[in-house]
């Protein structure tokens, strides 16, 4: 019997920006598995700028778990220019992520995220 993931990750590169769309459920160990897969996609594309569209993700880490996750795991995405696209109801995650030390910038409009990343010089 095949074990089907509760989430999906799709990606494409547009104008030098890796765009990743996460959908489905993110709970428990799924978050770490997704982060590892995301790292693999970033490495495979040699990306420096990433849009992470999480608007369709169900379930999130709480603020304490975000902090613990960042402190206990080292992922490539932590070193990149990242725009997170999310729904307005999840705006409090922007503060939690910033407090955990991640330099991600939050957007509710994907076109604004693209414009912001295009304005940034590559590292």
Task: Name each region found by the language model.
Residues 2-123:
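Amphipathic, Lys/Arg-enriched alpha-helical "gate/interface" segment within cytosolic domains
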């Amino acid at each position: 019997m095949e074990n089907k993931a509760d989430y999906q990750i799709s990606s494409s590169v547009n104008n030098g920006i890796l765009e990743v769309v996460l959908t489905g459920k993110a709970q428990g160990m799924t978050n770490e598995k997704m982060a590892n897969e995301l790292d693999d996609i970033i490495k495979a594309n040699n990306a420096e700028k990433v849009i992470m569209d999480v608007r369709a993700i169900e379930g999130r880490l709480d603020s304490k778990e975000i902090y613990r996750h960042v402190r206990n795991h080292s992922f490539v995405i932590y070193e990149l220019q990242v725009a997170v696209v999310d729904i307005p109801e999840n705006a409090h995650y922007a503060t939690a992520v910033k407090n955990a030390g991640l330099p991600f910038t939050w957007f509710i409009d994907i076109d604004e995220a693209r414009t912001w990343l295009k304005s940034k010089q590559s590292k």
